[in-house]
């Protein structure tokens, strides 16, 4: 279901997964692995570092980048932090929990336009059609 994430969050999740599974890695190596520029990687690292407390990303001019984690924090923590930032997952959760009954209510709750709600729903529907359900215009899951 990572395909539902927007491009930025998907890239940030890829960065976190790579950092979780490696020791030190340079920005250039990381950029090559995820097919992005070093500048994009540096910007993402800054944003990611803010969202993953108590974990942290440390940088060294010589060694590169490392994810500092403690043994009590499971890998699922990074996924939960990414999902917290995802408009798509927030929208899905809101619909699944039956908190809204219209696009207008959904747009008010999420502080986005109805047009953006429609775009996100269309993008989600493209991915979930393989699971034989979809979100209708009446904000129902069928």
Give residue spans per PLM region.
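Short, basic/aromatic recognition patches that contact phosphate-bearing ligands
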Residues: 1-142
């Amino acid at each position: 279901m990572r395909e539902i994430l927007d491009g930025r969050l998907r890239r940030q999740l890829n960065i976190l997964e790579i950092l979780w599974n490696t020791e030190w890695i340079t920005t250039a190596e990381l950029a090559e692995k995820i097919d992005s520029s070093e500048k994009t990687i540096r910007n993402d690292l800054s944003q990611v570092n803010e969202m993953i407390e108590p974990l942290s990303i440390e940088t060294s001019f010589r060694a590169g980048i490392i994810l500092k984690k403690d043994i009590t924090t499971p890998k699922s923590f990074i996924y939960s932090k990414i999902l917290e930032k995802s408009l798509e997952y927030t929208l899905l959760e809101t619909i699944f929990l039956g908190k809204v009954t219209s696009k207008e209510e959904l747009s008010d709750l999420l502080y986005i336009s109805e047009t953006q709600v429609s775009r996100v729903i269309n993008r989600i529907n493209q991915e979930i059609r393989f699971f034989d359900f979809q979100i209708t215009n009446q904000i129902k899951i069928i």
